[in-house]
């Protein structure tokens, strides 16, 4: 699809049901009727960045900060594996407390003790760190590009440039990571043309995974009074992402459940072409009686989906949980042409 056709489809509210049906057909053909369950460990909400839309921003004095220890991270990852999930996602703010050596040790311990894939979502790190994490056994990296509008990116992420973000994403692929990207739908000042540019990027880059989420204003950020992203508009972005990437893993994030707790992720599966759900595996349980609750707080009152709730979403959508690690379908030589 060219940018003009993508923009027209994005703006065609009356024709969205046909778009949703096409996305579901593409998903069924290229991904099958199974879905990937991936357990997420939110291990730190410290962050050196000051993104205007994120509750983890360093200028937020009201957030309760936490850091999990290496043992806690590993134990949680092993519990995810024991629950039958084939992928562990280690996610944090951009937190330099966790050194290259610390993270490499955590990754090695996980892959030595469990047959799981390790996905990282740690923000931007030096290339030597990224290479070391790959060598330690991490095979995937999720780094959302957020928006392909460089001016909007700079406004939303003070002091940062889109060109640097894209360069890092390209480096991840060069290092051999299965590489995930994604955007935010509904950012203040974002246009339909901006969203079309995101979809063109998905089409050109053909990522191994896409993570799309809505803008939800956080009460402790400068954007607290802005409007929440629109569900139908976001689902049209989902559907177009599925159509242009065909067999990319497309995730229905927890923020989708925050926007619509009852049906958000279900709709992402049956209308948007999603085939991945990533339940939250915090709080970490030290024992059956000692529960440590860790709140990631990217958005106010973020809806966290448990493993059982994620399985219920799949049941409603008529999908079975896929066995194994759920590696990129692009690895089978099925790149979109």
Regions found by a protein language model. Name each.
Residues 126-133, 188-202, 258-272:
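Catalytic cores of alpha/beta
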Residues 1-14, 209-337:
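Auxiliary Fe-S-binding modules of radical SAM enzymes
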Residues 41-43, 94-96, 122-126, 147-149, ...:
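Active-site-proximal loop/turn and secondary-structure-junction residues that shape catalytic pockets
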């Amino acid at each position: 699809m060219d940018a003009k056709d993508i923009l027209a489809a994005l703006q065609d509210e009356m024709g969205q049901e046909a778009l949703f049906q096409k996305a579901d057909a593409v998903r069924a053909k290229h991904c099958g009727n199974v879905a990937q369950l991936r357990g997420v460990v939110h291990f730190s909400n410290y962050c050196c960045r000051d993104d205007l839309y994120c509750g983890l921003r360093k200028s937020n004095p009201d957030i309760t900060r936490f850091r999990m220890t290496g043992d806690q991270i590993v134990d949680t990852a092993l519990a995810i594996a024991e629950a039958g999930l084939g992928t562990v996602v280690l996610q944090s703010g951009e937190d330099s407390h966790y050194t290259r050596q610390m993270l490499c040790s955590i990754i090695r311990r996980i892959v030595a003790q469990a047959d799981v894939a390790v996905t990282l979502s740690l923000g931007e790190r030096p290339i030597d760190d990224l290479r070391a994490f790959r060598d330690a056994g991490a095979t995937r990296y999720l780094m959302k590009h957020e928006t392909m509008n460089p001016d909007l990116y700079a406004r939303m992420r003070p002091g940062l440039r889109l060109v640097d973000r894209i360069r890092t994403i390209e480096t991840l692929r060069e290092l051999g990571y299965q590489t995930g990207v994604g955007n935010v739908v509904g950012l203040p000042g974002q246009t339909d043309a901006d969203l079309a540019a995101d979809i063109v990027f998905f089409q050109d880059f053909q990522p191994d995974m896409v993570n799309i989420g809505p803008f939800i204003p956080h009460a402790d950020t400068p954007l607290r009074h802005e409007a929440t992203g629109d569900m139908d508009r976001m689902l049209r972005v989902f559907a177009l992402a599925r159509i242009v990437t065909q067999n990319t893993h497309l995730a229905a994030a927890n923020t989708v459940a925050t926007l619509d707790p009852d049906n958000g992720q279900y709709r992402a599966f049956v209308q948007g072409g999603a085939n991945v759900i990533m339940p939250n595996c915090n709080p970490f349980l030290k024992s059956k009686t000692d529960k440590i609750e860790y709140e990631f707080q990217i958005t106010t009152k973020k809806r966290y989906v448990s493993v059982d709730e994620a399985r219920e979403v799949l049941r409603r959508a008529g999908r079975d949980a896929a066995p194994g690690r759920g590696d990129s379908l692009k690895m089978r030589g099925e790149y979109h042409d």
